[in-house]
Amino acid sequence: MKVLAIDIGGTKIALGNVVEGHLQHRKQFPTPVVNDATTLAKEILAHCQAWLSDVDAIGISTTGLVSEQGISAINPGTLSFPTPFPLHSELHRLSGKPVKMLNDAQAAAWYEFLQLSPELDVRNMAYITVSTGVGGGLVINQQLHKGKSNFAGHIGHTVLDPNGPLCGCQQRGCVEAIASGNAINAGAQALFGQAISNIELFQLAQHNEQASTLIQQSAEAIAQLCLNLKATLDLDLVVIGGGVGLARGYLARVQAFIDKQPLVFQVKVRAAVGDYDACLLGAAFQFEESNLS
């Protein structure tokens, strides 16, 4: 099967030509500020016009809550589209192709689960993306768990500290408000008094204790989330992805914190095999229907 895969993020939109499960071509462009889905759908199709006639279907993965009506941002700070944003229906109307849409972390969770060796006998798994925000997807009893309203897996908006920083979702102390790329970036600017990208911060952390502490705070928040999920869902595995989650040394910090806790709460973490494109590949793998609830 040939699928046009689209991954909608807070800062970029990635496009992929996925043929029989393999990413053949890829491109991306900055997420634009748009007021209607038709404008964005036309821009997306213009970027991949050379692939369009050859694909069988279009798969979308997106940050936010996905419903039949479209995309709704849980945290408007990570996605500024008006809601609900009917991108899927506009892409179908303009292209004539069948279109499916999933939350990005749910899509990545399903892709990552399908890549696991059967010998691992993983029944319950979580995927956590640490990027602009913090998202998640859950596979329970070897089925993607979305819930009645597709809200399952929004674990970035579980609260670690009720007195913590205000999140864009209007709760205080969410994992996203403590551990996300946006949170790290805000902390770095407050600490150093100037704009520092997260790439620069990770480089600085190799020899600067303050920078290292900022990253450690994020990693420990994600580790605590993993521990909580193990206690709640008896997870066999947590897969971590995203620009921050896959940054050099980050996963080791998460696992080291987990390994210091009581054994019953510990869970193995591993990097996404889809690397930075797990969500993009997950967009295409929606058409792998087996156990996709």
Curated annotation (Swiss-Prot):
It is an enzyme of class 2 (transferase). Its EC number is 2.7.1.60. Gene3D superfamilies: 3.30.420.40. InterPro entries: ATPase_NBD, ManNAc_kinase_bac, ROK, ROK_cs. ATP binds at residues 5-12, 133-140. GO terms for molecular function: ATP binding; N-acylmannosamine kinase activity; zinc ion binding. Pfam families: ROK. Pathway: Amino-sugar metabolism; N-acetylneuraminate degradation; D-fructose 6-phosphate from N-acetylneuraminate: step 2/5. Zn(2+) binds at residues 157, 167, 169, 174. It catalyses: an N-acyl-D-mannosamine + ATP = an N-acyl-D-mannosamine 6-phosphate + ADP + H(+). One of its GO terms (biological process) is N-acetylneuraminate catabolic process. Keywords: ATP-binding, Carbohydrate metabolism, Kinase, Metal-binding, Nucleotide-binding, Transferase, Zinc. Catalyzes the phosphorylation of N-acetylmannosamine (ManNAc) to ManNAc-6-P. Belongs to the ROK (NagC/XylR) family. NanK subfamily. Homodimer. This is N-acetylmannosamine kinase. It comes from Vibrio vulnificus (strain CMCP6). The lineage of its organism: Bacteria, Pseudomonadati, Pseudomonadota, Gammaproteobacteria, Vibrionales.
